[in-house]
Curated annotation (Swiss-Prot):
GO biological process: glutathione metabolic process
Species, as recorded: Fasciola hepatica (Liver fluke)
Task of the protein: Conjugation of reduced glutathione to a wide number of exogenous and endogenous hydrophobic electrophiles. GST isoenzymes appear to play a central role in the parasite detoxification system. Other functions are also suspected including a role in increasing the solubility of haematin in the parasite gut.
Residues involved in substrate binding: Y111
Protein's UniProt name: Glutathione S-transferase class-mu 26 kDa isozyme 7
Family statement drawn from the similarity comment of this UniProt entry: Belongs to the GST superfamily. Mu family.
Enzyme's top EC category: transferase
Subunit structure: Homodimer.
Pfam family, one: GST_C_3
Catalytic activity: RX + glutathione = an S-substituted glutathione + a halide anion + H(+)
Domain GST C-terminal, chain residue ranges per copy: 85-203
Gene3D superfamilies named in the record: 1.20.1050.130
Molecular function GO terms recorded: glutathione transferase activity
Amino acid sequence: MPAKLGYWKIRGLQQPVRLFLEYLGEEYEEHLYGRNDREKWLGDKFNMGLDLPNLPYYIDDKCKLTQSVAIMRYIADKHGMLGSTPEERARISMIEGAAMDLRIGFGLTCYNPKFEELKGDYLKGLPTTLKMWSDFLGDRQYLIGSSVSHVDFMVYEALDCIRYLAPQCLDDFPKLKEFKSRIEDLPKIKEYMKSERFIKWPLHSWTSPFGGGDAPPA
């Protein structure tokens, strides 16, 4: 039976989960809540048997989960992709936390009502952050080596969202630019991105000063 996902009809915190499942070729069904479906979600929220009800959620025949990182870790663990030693698992966990910092740092700026005032400071600090990630990636193909892991999709998604605000941000970081292209060129990811199921926009909730609305900036 396919896993069931639930989230808003946006990219948000669910997009890395979608990308990871597509890469793995794992079947899933997704319930998408639209812009005007808040009351519908509130009606569903406490009637699904979720321990800590929230979006996104993931339900399969053995588990009901919320929280995007927990979902990613569970899927990775099912496929034997969480590392084979305490050191490897700790490193993956570290990358997860840093990837969430990258994505949420961008999101907090974009959601702020004073976005136009704050974006200058965000963009000023961005090269330092990207240099850290470029140095960490080094000469590896992917973040933990030569094999794809769930954290690659977390970092990829953050980078892809940031480039809507700063289209040239990776020009000084060719290793990150190549990493981003490498993810997009994975056959199943490329196919997914061409499909009608792929959500390109919005990045955030529809009301977000940046990354919201119905269409990307021109």
